[in-house]
């Protein structure tokens, strides 16, 4: 049975999630118990996918009035253009549409220019509005236009520069991943009396565009989708949960054997000697018939009546179509209802 390869492996419980004051950015997930070695296998795989493969939004280019290239400087701006571009790379964005999109910034001094001053379309959210882009002296002003796109992983500036780029357009290195940091460790954990299992502890930090819990879920879904192509066999059909079983014309408990009733030795021997095997055989007997059984007395009768009453049954019942021809097969099929 090929399904034993995966069915007999222990399955972890739903991950425990620990969050701090900012659940949208930082979380710790604990999954246990895992088979020995699966902590590293899953932890490393999830970490790599989290850092490289999740979709996000980032600035891919910027144009600054009065700037021809990134090695320029602006009068009245304390930072040079290289530093401004580095600050632009750290903008945390959430985009609800396909790119490219444009954002504009107009500011006058004195003071710090922050991301909250950027004019963005309705389908772009700026998640770190207090992030400083540059600092202006009194009387200085600046105007910038940003190009925002969606993507995954890291894309260098030269890949973001279009062939027909106008003079003054500065391509920006883009880190699209909303995940800023992923760390994991594996510790031994107990399952029953055995300590030979793994506990996976993952710490995930994002820029707020996606929660850490959702980020892990997306990474797991990516792995699931990629691994699916390696399953080259057809799995045995599973029984659908809740699938209706064929109806019995009697209570399934009647298929239970009388030696499972935990009767006294005397009562059990009397039933055995009278060839009473199933509860269905027993309940069709009347009290008078039972008392005519050799060595069967009133005490044994009361014991059996009490046990049957606990099952909602009694002696002297009429059971149509008893015994069924395939009684042993039916007993196995309806075992969970007995």
UniProtKB/Swiss-Prot annotation:
<keyword id="KW-0808">Transferase</keyword>
<feature type="region of interest" description="Alpha N-terminal domain (alpha-NTD)">
    <location>
        <begin position="1"/>
        <end position="234"/>
    </location>
</feature>
<keyword id="KW-0240">DNA-directed RNA polymerase</keyword>
<dbReference type="GO" id="GO:0005737">
    <property type="term" value="C:cytoplasm"/>
</dbReference>
<comment type="subunit">
    <text>Homodimer. The RNAP catalytic core consists of 2 alpha, 1 beta, 1 beta' and 1 omega subunit. When a sigma factor is associated with the core the holoenzyme is formed, which can initiate transcription.</text>
</comment>
<dbReference type="InterPro" id="IPR011773">
    <property type="entry name" value="DNA-dir_RpoA"/>
</dbReference>
<dbReference type="InterPro" id="IPR036603">
    <property type="entry name" value="RBP11-like"/>
</dbReference>
<dbReference type="GO" id="GO:0006351">
    <property type="term" value="P:DNA-templated transcription"/>
</dbReference>
<feature type="region of interest" description="Alpha C-terminal domain (alpha-CTD)">
    <location>
        <begin position="250"/>
        <end position="338"/>
    </location>
</feature>
<dbReference type="GO" id="GO:0003899">
    <property type="term" value="F:DNA-directed RNA polymerase activity"/>
</dbReference>
<comment type="function">
    <text>DNA-dependent RNA polymerase catalyzes the transcription of DNA into RNA using the four ribonucleoside triphosphates as substrates.</text>
</comment>
<dbReference type="InterPro" id="IPR011263">
    <property type="entry name" value="DNA-dir_RNA_pol_RpoA/D/Rpb3"/>
</dbReference>
<dbReference type="GO" id="GO:0000428">
    <property type="term" value="C:DNA-directed RNA polymerase complex"/>
</dbReference>
<comment type="similarity">
    <text>Belongs to the RNA polymerase alpha chain family.</text>
</comment>
<dbReference type="Pfam" id="PF01193">
    <property type="entry name" value="RNA_pol_L"/>
</dbReference>
<keyword id="KW-0548">Nucleotidyltransferase</keyword>
<dbReference type="GO" id="GO:0003677">
    <property type="term" value="F:DNA binding"/>
</dbReference>
<keyword id="KW-0804">Transcription</keyword>
<dbReference type="InterPro" id="IPR036643">
    <property type="entry name" value="RNApol_insert_sf"/>
</dbReference>
<protein>
    <recommendedName>
        <fullName>DNA-directed RNA polymerase subunit alpha</fullName>
        <ecNumber>2.7.7.6</ecNumber>
    </recommendedName>
</protein>
<dbReference type="InterPro" id="IPR011262">
    <property type="entry name" value="DNA-dir_RNA_pol_insert"/>
</dbReference>
<dbReference type="Pfam" id="PF03118">
    <property type="entry name" value="RNA_pol_A_CTD"/>
</dbReference>
<dbReference type="GO" id="GO:0046983">
    <property type="term" value="F:protein dimerization activity"/>
</dbReference>
<dbReference type="InterPro" id="IPR011260">
    <property type="entry name" value="RNAP_asu_C"/>
</dbReference>
<dbReference type="Pfam" id="PF01000">
    <property type="entry name" value="RNA_pol_A_bac"/>
</dbReference>
